From Swiss-Prot:
GO biological process: peptide biosynthetic process
NCBIfam families: efp, PRK00529.1
Lineage: Bacteria, Pseudomonadati, Nitrospirota, Thermodesulfovibrionia, Thermodesulfovibrionales
Family: Belongs to the elongation factor P family.
GO CC annotation terms, alphabetical: cytoplasm
Keywords: Cytoplasm, Elongation factor, Protein biosynthesis
Entry superkingdom: Bacteria
Listed GO MF terms: translation elongation factor activity
Pfam hit, one: EFP
Keyword set includes Transcription: no
Pathway annotation: Protein biosynthesis; polypeptide chain elongation
InterPro entries per record: Elong-fact-P_C (IPR015365), NA-bd_OB-fold (IPR012340), Rib_uL2_dom2 (IPR014722), Transl_elong_fac_P/YeiP (IPR020599), Transl_elong_KOW-like (IPR013185), Transl_elong_P/YeiP_cen (IPR001059), Transl_elong_P/YeiP_CS (IPR013852), Transl_elongation_fac_P (IPR011768)
Protein name as catalogued: Elongation factor P
Amino acid sequence: MISTSEFKKGLKIEYKGEPYEIIDFQHVKMQQRAPIVRTKIKHLKTGRVLEENFPAGEKFEKPELEEKQMQYLYSQGDSYVFMDMESYEQISIPKERIGDAIYYIKDEMIVDVIYYKGEPLVIEPPMFVELRVAETEPAFKGDTASGGTKPAKLETGLTVKVPFHIQTGDLLKIDTRTGEYIEKVKE
C-alpha cells in the first residue's frame, strides 16, 4: 500500500481500479480542516489527466505493472512495432499510447515497455538519448555575447533549444524527462 505521504512525481498508483501516474502533488493544510493532498494524476491507459484531492494518509494499491525490455523496429501506419528481447515476439503499439516518447526513440533502440494486466501501456525511453540535429539556423558572429539559445529540429522531429554554436549534423545528448538539451556529444 502507498500512502499519500509517500507520493512523488512519477509514482504509479491504482485508483478506482485503474493505473495512474502522479504528475504533480501538493500537501495542503487548511485552517480547521483535515489536510489534503492536491494531486494531478495521468491515466496510464488513456493519457487523460485528472486533478484529485485526497485526504492526507489515504492509502492506494500499487498497480501490478510488468516491465519488459523491447527493441523498436519500425513504424507501420499509426502504430509502432517493438520486439521483445527475450521471446523475440513482435508487438504493435498504437501511436496514441506512445505519446511524446516517440520523439526520443530511434530505430533499433532498446526501451522499457510497461505492461498492465498483459497489455502494453507506456513506453519509457532511456533517461538520456543521443540525437542528431536535422536542421537549425546558422550562428552569426556576435550571437554568442548574450549566451542565448536557438531552436534546433532533431532527427526524430523533436525541437529543442540549443546554444548558438550547435550546427546541423551535430550529435546532442537530450534528457528524455524534460526534453532539454544537455550537451554536445564528441564524435
